[in-house]
Amino acid sequence: MDTTELRIDTAGRHVLDLTDRAAAFAARAGGDGLLCVFVPHATAGLAVMETGSGSEEDLEEVMGRLLPRDDRWSHRHGSRGHGADHLLPVFASPSLTVPVQAGRLLLGTWQRICLVDLNDDNPQRRVRLSFLSGR
């Protein structure tokens, strides 16, 4: 298994496209297999989605309605509404798997791999990429 860890500075951005970095890693690994992407954080997740057409803003708006940043949450440590951050991985899984053929991600035309992080308390994130060869 080939693996690497990306260090991401979210710097107030809530949806970050990781596709190019994931594709470069898969190309270096080469061959056929599975790319596993994992976020080792309790307040961030991953999504496969279209980007650049307003979908990022739509996702933020929907998540804001589903998980408002107020004091309703039982989980209360951290900043106001931090309990909502701990529910995000229920909607945006901390892991996903993408098939790879001849070193290329087999994503659909408009599909991108995105880090989803609505938590402003921790701008430093890690993302683990692992390539499982089909050999």
Predicted features by range, described:
Residues 1-135:
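Active-site histidine-anchored catalytic micro-motif
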